[in-house]
């Protein structure tokens, strides 16, 4: 595999997913639905471990809701159903009989969870309630589907749902969710822009939506996480009320925030190279592969394999996910190719020199170079190199993303740069009319930056020429 991801990202991405064994897409006989083979499932599990750890440590509790939602529930919040109705899969028959009420395959769970919270919540003492689940969701995508990026079955959807006593409590929860997501992406080395989506592009039923976006190798932007302040838009129709400390009754204030398969899509796309995957050690299904170098003499070959097994046992005992590749039908070069494609962070090569000396030869996936490590220091050095590798991957990814963001002051400049797959920031007066014109003529408005100073002091709106209030981000998106 020698594909350039910047020149032909789509082919590169599909090839890496398939040949690495990460995700099998396009062969299962339902459009927009793929299969996680064992290698990909292990990666998925390790990424979810990070997410679960960060949610559990901040007081979230995991739940599991049914996949079917009655149409009567979805219709209770009118703006919500308008936003999703065209994307819903409906179950209308049970066996040979028509159902009295059509059932939706869960597109998201605000309605289902609000319904149950109306039974569960009665007092301010139960608040905040912070729940999450990791489940498949279903969207009838009519656009071209893409593996892990645009699917009809989003098999890995982490949705958190919280309930609070006040607007401010929910607002603070949104801030906490943003910090959690920053930690998730930082541990994966994925760069991100944080923007408040414009009012016409917020989540259906939310007061406001904050989104995390990253820049893919082809310059298009991928939304990788969202945080929504729902206000009381769901608690009122679903009667989610509680007794306040003063003895009154009030409706809870809610938030929801989600991550999906796109986290893994961005992990693959941002870090991979012409040889395949490049994975951060924390989430690599195999962290270390040991490759014995074949020897002509039988006794020397035996010693090489013994040393390889000794190193394997030591590393496994220390907690490293380690594979000894002692297949004799493959050359070392063929093994290097296969394990590089799978993104294994470290390869230890053991031959005659390593048997007779006190050093091991270690190849690091992100740098494509070999280093010598003393045998007694292998565990500590791998720990140090793991930290250095993540930092290197993170810095390289952030550098690329920042190089794709340009600040301009006219629609003409913006159009030209967006066509060249840059993210542009341009001054905006704040009016919906001007924002929609940018949407139509330039690219999708991502929103007002929250990760930098977004006030456009002294600037003029790029559309109407009036005094600008904010800088807004615009890009071509998936």
From Swiss-Prot:
Annotated domain remarks: Consists of three domains: the N-terminal catalytic domain, the anticodon-binding domain and the C-terminal extension.
Role description: Catalyzes the attachment of proline to tRNA(Pro) in a two-step reaction: proline is first activated by ATP to form Pro-AMP and then transferred to the acceptor end of tRNA(Pro).
Any one of the GO CC terms: aminoacyl-tRNA synthetase multienzyme complex
Catalytic activity annotation: tRNA(Pro) + L-proline + ATP = L-prolyl-tRNA(Pro) + AMP + diphosphate
Alphabetical list of InterPro entries matching this protein: aa-tRNA-synt_IIb, aa-tRNA-synth_II, aa-tRNA-synth_II/BPL/LPL, Anticodon-bd, Anticodon-bd_dom_sf, Pro-tRNA-ligase_IIa, Pro-tRNA-ligase_IIa_arc-type, Pro-tRNA_ligase_II_C
SMART domains named in the record: ProRS-C_1
Keyword entries, A-Z: Aminoacyl-tRNA synthetase, ATP-binding, Cytoplasm, Ligase, Nucleotide-binding, Protein biosynthesis
Subunit structure: Homodimer.
HAMAP family reported for this sequence: Pro_tRNA_synth_type3
Catalytic class of the enzyme: ligase
Keyword Translocase set for record: no
Similarity comment: Belongs to the class-II aminoacyl-tRNA synthetase family. ProS type 3 subfamily.
Pfam families according to UniProt: HGTP_anticodon, ProRS-C_1, tRNA-synt_2b
Protein name (Swiss-Prot/TrEMBL): Proline--tRNA ligase
GO molecular function: ATP binding; proline-tRNA ligase activity
EC numbers for this chain: 6.1.1.15
Cysteine pairings via disulfide bonds: none
The organism of origin for this protein: Ignicoccus hospitalis (strain KIN4/I / DSM 18386 / JCM 14125)
Gene Ontology biological-process annotations: prolyl-tRNA aminoacylation
Subcellular location(s) per record: Cytoplasm
